Design a protein with these regions (language model features):
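Solvent-exposed, amphipathic alpha-helical segments
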Residues: 18, 22-29, 75-79, 107, ...
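Amphipathic alpha-helical packing segments from all-alpha helical-bundle domains
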Residues: 73, 78, 100-109, 120-146, ...
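Short loop-to-helix capping motifs
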Residues: 56, 117-119
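Hydrophobic alpha-helical connector segments
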Residues: 63, 74-106, 151, 155-162, ...
Length: 233
């Protein structure tokens, strides 16, 4: 590849990464209502670069929200990895998702609502949910199932139910703030109510498991490829 081509590609990578980093910060601070101007100011970029790399602010938001929730899921798994019982595992998992990582979960819940009017962005949501559900299945296999507890539904169904409950609680928490009304114990009970896990399973010891399978949450793959909207312009 000519030197000028490599330089252009590297510049594209740098710009796209800067926009993603800035957008993650600005969206975390201001939510979906953050403006392109705010993002560009933080990234030292121009508005037309948002259009070139992402097509629209909405697509940028959905990409950022997807990366955020995947990182939240990974952080929750890592935080719970040292748990000695199922109860401790579930408390740590849910507590992390609705505590330190609540904003990331909330952003993705907002992104899911956004695609109701931007159906062209649904594939981004679907891909993220697929990864979350697959990782949820792995988590169930490494905890509840290996205690001998028989799930009432398929493990894929239970993994989807887990995340549906987490998203619902995150939205309630964001909407009510200090009036949320759920203690950690209450939130855990809500998330796992359909599993009907008896106390003897919750208190079952967990054997150590191997390292978590790495999952790429980087959204910087085709870094200097313009968005479909830009290509059609």
């Amino acid at each position: 590849m000519p030197t000028t081509g490599r330089a252009t590609r590297e510049a594209g990578k740098t710009t796209r990464k800067s926009l993603l980093r800035a957008a993650a910060e600005v969206f975390a601070e201001n939510g979906e209502s953050a403006s392109v101007a705010q993002i560009c100011q933080r990234a030292d970029a121009y508005p037309n670069q948002v259009t070139y790399y992402f097509g629209s602010k909405e697509q940028l938001f959905v990409e950022v929200a997807g990366a955020c929730v995947l990182r939240a899921g990974r952080r929750a798994e890592e935080a719970a990895a040292g748990a000695e019982t199922v109860r401790e595992y579930t408390n740590t998992l849910v507590g992390t998702l609705l505590g330190p990582c609540a904003r990331d979960v909330e952003l993705f819940a907002t992104a899911m609502l956004l695609v109701a009017r931007r159906t062209d962005l649904r594939p981004l949501i679907t891909e993220t949910l697929t990864v979350l559900h697959e990782r949820g299945e792995e988590a169930l296999l490494s905890t509840l199932v290996r205690t001998g507890w028989q799930l009432r539904a398929g493990i894929d169904v239970e993994a989807r139910a887990f995340w549906s409950a987490i998203f619902g609680l995150a939205v309630q928490k964001a909407a009510t703030g200090a009036d949320f009304g759920y203690r950690l114990e209450d939130a855990v009970a809500v998330v796992f109510t359909n599993l009907q896990i008896p106390d003897e399973v919750l208190d079952s010891p967990l054997r150590p498991v191997g390292p978590l399978r790495p999952v790429d949450t980087d959204t910087d793959t085709d870094t200097d490829t313009p968005s479909p909207a830009a290509q059609e312009a």
